[in-house]
């Protein structure tokens, strides 16, 4: 079965909000074996919406609409689809009572336009809105299925999970779709693809989809099977083949981001961490503290942006700052070692470099040094040559910090 997602709302076309509903629905539909080949966005205009409906009917079995179910004049989705299908709109008594009770409870006037939210297509399966007012609905006609959902994600997502997915499962073949994301760092997308190109070229079931994202590369493995455990076996076989070739760059699965993996390993090792941040200006420490329970391993950090802080707080010798510069291997080494000592941690990590857009100390933007000092281990400094905008360089530097921390922790 093929579906098309039609998002209705001029605010989407103006870029005022992102179409996160389409991403959510595509992922959920794929998991139950429904293909999505088109996303359409159309403004609050009945003529253009009608054209979008006609185009979708030519290429999809299931048309899923988000948005346009509210009380205002520009909420046109129900009316346009009713006219297109030559169906009446009727009041759903449960929804009408829910809306009426809300206005009574809040002491507000229950106006005629608010009643509009309780209108549904005649004969439709009604999906209760447990987090808002306008119900969703599903109707089958002319060998097509039309699903109408509210636009706000906080209403649409729980409605889909509770009511729409069970409704849609009636149209699926019973095949389950199982996906696993493999995460890699320290290798470019093109390099990784070359190493697994024959597997990508020969893919059938499971499929392999590479994606590069801000210094990382992921491979999404997706298998179809009526039995979930069999789908998992198919994926495991391909994963084993991939990791035989590029396993040195692999660090985690699915939502296991670098900062999470590094901090979890710190906890398991029972070690503590401190950071000295010049270039990154607190980005690294901020990501550290996104992890719950991190106070057991994170002593704190020093944002040593000015050379005075490097010299007087973290004791980088004046000679190093004048001779080698703040952006240097020697400075990164002192910062990592001394923040570890000052904050009495087991591990010190440091970041210094040039984010751009201009050069500094006659060093080009993207020149970066990450220092890592671990007790009873020699200090290591990792030189990096990064590209991108100022913000991208800073964010990628922080990621490299987590990556090198994770890899060193694996070794000890």
UniProtKB/Swiss-Prot annotation:
It comes from the Bacteria. Pfam families: CinA, CinA_KH, MoCF_biosynth. CDD domains: cinA (cd00885). PANTHER family: NICOTINAMIDE-NUCLEOTIDE AMIDOHYDROLASE PNCC, NMN AMIDOHYDROLASE-LIKE PROTEIN YFAY. Belongs to the CinA family. HAMAP family: CinA_B. NCBIfam families: cinA_nterm, molyb_syn, PncC_domain, PRK00549.1. This is Putative competence-damage inducible protein. It comes from Bacillus cereus (strain ATCC 14579 / DSM 31 / CCUG 7414 / JCM 2152 / NBRC 15305 / NCIMB 9373 / NCTC 2599 / NRRL B-3711).
């Amino acid at each position: 079965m093929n579906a098309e997602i039609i998002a209705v709302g001029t605010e989407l076309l103006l870029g005022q909000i992102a179409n996160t509903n389409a991403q959510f629905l595509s992922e959920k539909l794929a998991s139950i074996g429904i293909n999505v080949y088109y996303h359409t966005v159309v403004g609050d205009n009945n003529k253009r919406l009608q054209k979008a409906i006609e185009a979708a009917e030519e290429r999809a079995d299931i048309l899923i609409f988000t948005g346009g179910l509210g009380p205002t004049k520009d909420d046109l989705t129900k009316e346009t689809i009713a006219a297109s299908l030559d169906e009446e709109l009727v009041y759903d008594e449960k929804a009408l009572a829910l809306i009426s009770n809300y206005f009574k409870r809040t002491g507000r006037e229950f106006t005629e336009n608010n009643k509009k939210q309780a209108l549904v297509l005649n004969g439709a399966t009604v999906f209760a809105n447990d987090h808002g007012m306008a119900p969703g609905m599903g109707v089958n006609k002319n060998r097509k299925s039309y699903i109408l959902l509210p636009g706000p994600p906080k209403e649409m997502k729980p409605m889909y999970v509770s009511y729409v997915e069970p409704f849609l499962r009636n149209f699926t073949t019973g095949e389950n779709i199982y996906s696993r994301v493999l995460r890699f760092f320290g290798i470019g997308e093109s390099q990784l693809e070359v190493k697994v190109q024959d597997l990508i070229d020969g893919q059938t079931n499971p499929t392999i989809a590479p994606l590069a994202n801000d210094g990382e590369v992921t491979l999404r493995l997706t298998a179809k099977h009526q039995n979930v455990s069999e789908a998992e076996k198919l994926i495991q076989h391909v994963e084993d083949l991939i990791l035989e070739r590029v396993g040195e760059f692999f660090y985690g699965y699915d939502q296991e981001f670098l900062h999470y993996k590094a901090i979890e390993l710190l906890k398991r090792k029972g070690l503590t961490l401190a950071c000295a941040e010049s270039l990154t200006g607190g980005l690294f420490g901020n990501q550290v503290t996104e992890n719950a329970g991190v106070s057991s391993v994170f002593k704190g950090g020093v944002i040593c942006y000015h050379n005075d802080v490097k010299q007087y707080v973290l004791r980088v010798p004046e000679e190093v700052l004048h001779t080698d510069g703040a952006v240097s291997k020697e400075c990164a080494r002192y910062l990592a070692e001394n923040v570890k000592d000052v904050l009495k941690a087991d591990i010190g990590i440091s970041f210094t470099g040039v984010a751009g857009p201009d050069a500094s100390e006659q060093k080009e933007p993207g020149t970066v040094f990450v220092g890592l000092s671990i007790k009873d281990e020699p200090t290591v400094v990792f030189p990096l040559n990064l590209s991108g905008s100022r913000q991208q360089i800073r964010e990628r530097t922080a990621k490299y910090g987590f990556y090198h921390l994770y890899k060193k922790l694996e070794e000890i």
